[in-house]
Regions:
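Membrane-interface motif at the C-terminal end of an N-terminal transmembrane signal
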Residues: 21-24
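Bacterial N-terminal signal peptides
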Residues: 9-19
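Bacterial N-terminal signal peptides that target proteins for export
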Residues: 1-11
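Proline/Glycine/Serine-rich low-complexity intrinsically disordered segments
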Residues: 15, 26-280
């Protein structure tokens, strides 16, 4: 995911001050949050483990961070806790520097990683991955009142801001070929070009965009425009819990819990808690 942790950390502090621990209003029923876990996907569940030792990092808001009380929280962390609640087992969440998370599992100091560790062929030599519990969509953001539905026709000849060399730039080039790409080197530069009118729209990840829209810099200038884009070939297949490659029993229990948490709206409710508005 490409977004500025500094931008989100600053905006998250403001949002938490304004709204308290639950940073969004509404409910799963009206959030538009999609079902992420197809019924029957993943590994079949066996007997639940007696407990789960999760590890995470503390420097990736709003997914895992230290709150104002000095406690670890965030979307990833609360998903981990919800898994244990669903399985009716105790769990712990320990903090490690991100580069040491894999070692914690390999050395049997932890059972599972809840930190958005990438699912790559190299890491699959050591890790197995749960079904996805979160996908960050891509979204268009435009200035008020120019919030017309984005389409190849409506954006023909328009300037669309993207992060240079990103998957978002690739997507616009492939599906909106008549749009003019305006590359930026950072999210701050990208959103500044939108607010100033240098570009007609930006296309980027919904997480960073949602925090910018809710923060003090945007000052209500802009809003999401159109729907969410989730094509896995461009935007990945989502965040997953990672366990030891040979721990199929634990993977099965986690997959089962995530299927249930998706079906009953818990994942959507947690997304509403940690993001300023629906990402979809």
């Amino acid at each position: 995911m490409r977004f500025s942790k500094a931008l989100i950390a600053a905006s998250l502090g403001i949002v938490l001050c304004l709204f308290g621990p639950s940073v969004s209003s509404g409910s799963a029923a009206d959030s538009g949050y999609p079902r992420l876990v197809p019924p029957g996907s993943g590994t079949a569940a066996g007997a639940s483990p007696p407990s789960i030792r999760f590890v995470t990092a503390d420097d990736f808001p709003p997914f895992n961070f230290i709150d104002g009380s000095g406690l670890i929280t965030g979307f990833n962390v609360e998903v981990a806790r919800a898994i244990c609640t669903r399985l009716a087992i105790p769990c712990t969440v320990q903090i490690r520097p991100f580069p040491l998370l894999l070692d914690a599992v390999r050395e049997n100091k932890a059972d599972a990683i809840a930190a958005g560790v990438a699912d790559t062929p190299a890491l699959r030599r050591h890790l197995a991955y749960s079904v996805p519990y979160f996908r960050e969509p891509a979204r268009f953001v435009r200035r008020w009142p120019a919030l017309v539905e984005p389409s190849p026709h409506s954006l023909s000849g328009k300037t669309v801001g993207v992060i240079a060399g990103s998957r978002y730039a690739d997507f616009i080039g492939d599906f909106f070929p008549a749009a003019k790409l305006h590359p930026s080197s950072s999210e701050a530069e990208l959103f500044a070009s939108l607010k100033s009118g240098e570009v007609d729209a930006v296309f980027t990840g919904a997480v960073g965009a949602s925090f910018w829209l809710a923060g003090p810099v945007a000052k209500g200038c802009c809003a999401f425009s159109g729907g969410a884009y989730t094509e896995p070939a461009y935007f990945g297949d989502g965040m997953k819990i990672a366990v030891a490659a040979d721990n199929t029993a634990l993977k099965g229990s986690i997959d089962s819990a995530l299927r249930a948490l998706d079906a009953d709206g818990t994942l959507a409710d947690l997304a509403l808690r940690f993001f300023p508005e629906s990402l979809y």
